[in-house]
Structure formats: C-alpha cells, structure tokens
Regions:
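Bacterial extracytoplasmic/cell-wall-associated proteins, especially those involved in peptidoglycan
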Residues: 1-163
Length: 163
C-alpha cells in the first residue's frame, strides 16, 4: 500500500529529469543553475505563460546590457524567507536598499540562487523568451495583470495609474 517518502522523491526526480533535465544534458552546469534561477523569478513575478515569455525577454535584455534586473519578487523573497518580516509582501522604496546578494535592485546579474521552485512554464519561458520593444513592466495592484512599457516615462506613468 503506502508509498514511502523515498519513492515519492524518486518519482519527483524522474519527472523532473523527463521534463526538464533532458533539455540541459548538453549544457554547461552554470547554464542549468542560471536557467532555474531566472525561472524562479518568473514564477514569482508574473502569472501567465505569455507574460512569463515577455518578462523573460526583458530580463535577458537587462542581463546582456548589464542593467540591474530590478525584480520585485527578489525583494519579497529577502523579506519573507531570509528576514522573516511580517510585512514581507508589500514593497517600500527603502527595501530596494536592503544589503543582500538577492537584491536585484542593488546588484546586477542574477541572484546567487533560486527564489522559488519554478514550474515547467517558467523554465520554458527562459528557453523561449519573447522578443519585444518593452524595457519595463509592473504588476497592476488591482488584478495582478502585467503592464508593459517601452520607455521609462511610460513606465512611470503606468506606475502612477496601476500602483
């Protein structure tokens, strides 16, 4: 009858290997880690597969140009998981100054590790980013949908409207 914890873990690892690892078998080890880190941010940052692909494209552009990723979900991770703050879901401007390698506002590049356990959709979005003219995005406060912008001016207007 009962399935042991070891059997459950083996099934999960087999499933992971079948769905994900096969795509990495010829990749360098750092590529695997970087993909999982990026996917973990997408998993926490946006909701829909289409938005994940668009945000993946934006984050790839930021990585290529050395611009800070500025992923709010990393601040939530720092506050909730690393600092155990009770107000961890809301973000204040002062949070962008928290000294942590996971702070993608202070430190360019990817954080040192994943911030969540990404799903297959987020991992696929890292492999298949959607190219666009967008450079900025935010989540609307009321319904969580992602609002994209081409310029900082447009982004700041969207922040005033949607946040």
């Amino acid at each position: 009858g009962d399935v042991s914890i070891k059997e459950v873990v083996e099934m999960m690892l087999d499933n992971f290997e079948n769905k994900v690892y096969s795509r990495f078998k010829n990749a360098a080890p750092h590529d695997f880690n970087e993909t999982i880190i990026m996917a973990s941010m997408l998993e926490e940052e946006v909701r829909t597969p289409k938005d994940m692909k668009l945000v993946s494209g934006i984050l790839h552009k930021r990585l290529e140009t050395g611009v800070a990723l500025q992923v709010d979900a990393t601040l939530v991770y720092i506050k909730c998981s690393l600092l155990n703050r009770p107000d961890c879901r809301s973000i204040a401007n002062t949070d962008k100054e928290i000294k942590s390698l996971y702070n993608t506002y202070l430190y360019p590049g990817l954080p040192p590790g994943p911030i969540s356990n990404p799903g297959l959709t987020a991992i696929e979005a890292v492999f298949d980013p959607e190219k666009s003219h967008y450079l900025y995005y935010l989540s609307a406060r009321d319904d969580g949908r992602t609002i994209f912008s081409r310029t900082l001016e447009e982004h700041n207007l969207n922040r005033a409207v949607y946040r």
